Amino acid sequence: QVKKQLESLPVLKPIEAESQDEKFLSNIIRLIEDHLSESELNVNALCELSGISNKQIYRKIKQLTGMSPVEYIKSTGMKKAAMLLQQKKFTVAEVMYMVGFSNHSYFSKCFQAEFGKTPRQYLNDEL
């Protein structure tokens, strides 16, 4: 009789602290941040580092963030660049290399697209 009662109880799944999507995204963010200074960081490198296929990375990042993986990597780099510039410890050129860019004009263009001002203007506004 006890056995029947136990069998009739609903099976409770352990409560997960994070959803699978949150785990996926936090893992991707960690990988991007860990390898941001590498100018070779791209979607293929991210696939290699994470062990996840290109198609799956694209689909999941697009679904969770609304951005393509390329846009997401670039956006993460720009946010990190803004944070580094706010610290006032580094020059624009140093920050550019720290977030994986080697072309100053392209870095400036991407930064301006993200924040509406050049890195130099951003730095001057923060002073």
What are these model-predicted stretches?
Residues 1-51, 60:
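Membrane-proximal linker segments that couple transmembrane helices to downstream signaling/catalytic modules
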Residues 63-102, 124-127:
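Terminal helix-turn-helix DNA-binding modules in bacterial transcription factors
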Residues 44-52, 57, 61, 95-102, ...:
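Append "Primarily bacterial transcriptional regulators
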Residues 109-127:
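…primarily DNA-binding HTH/wHTH and HhH modules…
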Residues 29-41, 61, 65, 82-91, ...:
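Basic, amphipathic alpha-helical hairpins
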Residues 52, 67, 117:
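Short glycine/serine/threonine/alanine-rich loop segments
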